[in-house]
């Protein structure tokens, strides 16, 4: 499918207008461990963790005047440094670019709102959206796993992590997105094989995931 034409106002605009509570489910997987021992973290923090896939399923809610019930949006992101390194005292990435997959069932207005929602919920992580593509998005959430497929990105996350006492394992990061009660997950599959980010990756079998429900209350804002 052909990417949608990017509108400068979509990518560069200030905070979008939104109204009504938005609730749903979220999952992310990174190319870096989020739960590890200090010995592992100190050796990898500067060199990995520059990419991630984030996915949202909206159960109900209105954003930027658009009802988004049942729609999904996925962002594959890549930066020039570990995306979360600021949390452990490092310098934040100077850029984080995103390829965004929007639900092919959405209208043009809903697609724009889904991109804005992803930018809003990821709290400024994304500095530039380089491609927007409507696709069929799978977001399967079961008692044990969450599986997402969208375009050239996919991830499968097992809920929970198993760990031993070696190297004093601990949680080093927090989710990129707004999440009510985030939980740790074990990434079974995580890849992006598309174009637009000058990077492709596959990073399975890591303690590199977060998941959980998200919700936030609407605020009236004026659109630019």
For the regions a protein language model found, what residue spans apply to each?
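Short, solvent-exposed mixed-charge patches
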Residues: 223-224
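N-terminal signal peptide c-region/cleavage motif recognized by signal peptidases
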Residues: 14-16
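Bacterial N-terminal signal peptides that target proteins for export
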Residues: 1-7
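Generic hydrophobic, helix-prone segments enriched in Leu/Val/Ile
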Residues: 2, 73-75, 88, 114-118
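N-terminal Sec/ER secretory leader and immediately downstream segment
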Residues: 20-99
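Absolute protein N-terminus
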Residues: 1, 19-20
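Mature, soluble, non-transmembrane domains
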Residues: 96-97, 101-217
């Amino acid at each position: 499918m052909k990417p949608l034409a990017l509108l400068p106002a979509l990518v560069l605009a200030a905070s979008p207008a939104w109204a009504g509570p938005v609730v749903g489910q979220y999952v992310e997987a990174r190319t870096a461990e989020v739960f590890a021992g200090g010995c592992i973290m100190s050796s990898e923090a500067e060199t990995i963790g520059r990419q991630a896939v984030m996915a949202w399923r909206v159960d109900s809610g209105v954003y930027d005047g658009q009802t988004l019930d049942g729609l999904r949006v996925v962002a594959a992101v890549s930066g020039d440094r570990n995306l979360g390194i600021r949390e452990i005292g490092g310098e934040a990435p100077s850029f984080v670019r995103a390829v965004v997959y929007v639900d092919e069932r959405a209208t043009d207005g809903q697609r724009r709102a889904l991109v804005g929602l992803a930018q809003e919920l990821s709290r400024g992580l994304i500095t530039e959206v380089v491609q927007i593509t409507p696709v069929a998005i799978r977001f399967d959430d079961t008692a044990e796993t969450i599986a997402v497929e969208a375009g050239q990105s996919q991830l499968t996350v097992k809920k929970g992590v198993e760990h031993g006492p070696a190297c004093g394992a601990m949680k080093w990061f927090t989710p990129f997105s707004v999440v009510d009660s985030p939980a740790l997950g074990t990434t079974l599959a995580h890849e992006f094989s598309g174009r637009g980010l000058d990077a492709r990756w596959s990073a399975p079998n890591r303690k590199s995931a977060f998941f959980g429900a998200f919700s936030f209350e609407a605020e009236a804002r004026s659109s630019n």
